[in-house]
Amino acid sequence: ARRKIVVSSLGPFPLQLRPADNQQAVDTMISHWKRELEQVLPDRPDLIVLPEACDRYPAMNKEERLSYYRFRGDKIRDFFRDVARRNRCYIAYSAAREMPDGTWRNSTLLIDRNGEIAGIYNKNYPTVGEVTEWKTLAGKEAPVFQTDFGRVGMAICFDLNFHELLERYAKQRPDLIIFSSMYHGGLMQGYGAYHCRSYFVGAIAGPENNILNPLGARVACSTNYLPRVTAAINLDYQVVHLDENWEKLEAVKKKYGRGVTVFDPGFVG
């Protein structure tokens, strides 16, 4: 598995439009994401992460949104599958999905470099409104998916507040956590990364997008001017306690020089 990879996170504000009809809604959304993707594709990222409900129109009322989602079907998903295939990258596409029984899931689909679906995560902790108004059922699994660069877990928005989910991931030792959200999460982002000992790539619609290392320290973030961030990360890492390892850390640095980085975030040992 390749260990040094490039990751991109996109976090533009949702489109504040009310398209005239469903076909226009789908076409406009695809054009929107095509423009956004064009900003990061020149960096040839291995993974692109999109925000929660990335193809939703907030201005639509419930009836309009249901009609749009049902017309949309897999059209926007298939657009992202084509982008992933043509650019040989993984894409985390987060969207509402209707099940055959009429219930809904808030899901992130991990699309691989061939445009195939490598895994699906269903939000474990939907909000009260999602459950009561949209018949969104909670996911029960905390799956970790194997990619060609490492093991990946996913979380969506409100999930980040629940230690139980992070604990399930921590036991599986993922290399990276994908976080698609409408909510930033604040200190819970760093806590999630540190608890799972995983890199963390957050895509939030509007606020800053963070890429954090397994100690919860920021590697890179988006700004108020540019709602996107790209960074190179190295998944060949190990989190160790300083006590009992001082001599080993000195020895590995002496042996490998600039080939190894010893990072200390301070104060946590």
Regions flagged by a language model, labelled:
Residues 2-23, 107, 120-122, 151-159, ...:
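Active-site-proximal beta-strand elements of phosphoester/diester hydrolases
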Residues 6, 43-44, 88, 151, ...:
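Short loop/turn motifs at secondary-structure junctions
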Residues 13-15, 54-57, 97-100, 127, ...:
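Solvent-exposed loop/turn segments at secondary-structure junctions
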Residues 24-114, 195:
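Cys-nucleophile CN-hydrolase/nitrilase-fold catalytic domain and related Cys-dependent amidase chemistry
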Residues 72-91, 160-267:
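CN hydrolase (nitrilase-like) catalytic-core segments centered on the catalytic cysteine
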Residues 93-95, 107-110, 143, 209-212, ...:
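Short beta-strand scaffold segments in enzyme catalytic cores
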Residues 99-172, 187-191, 195:
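Active-site catalytic loop in hydrolytic enzyme cores
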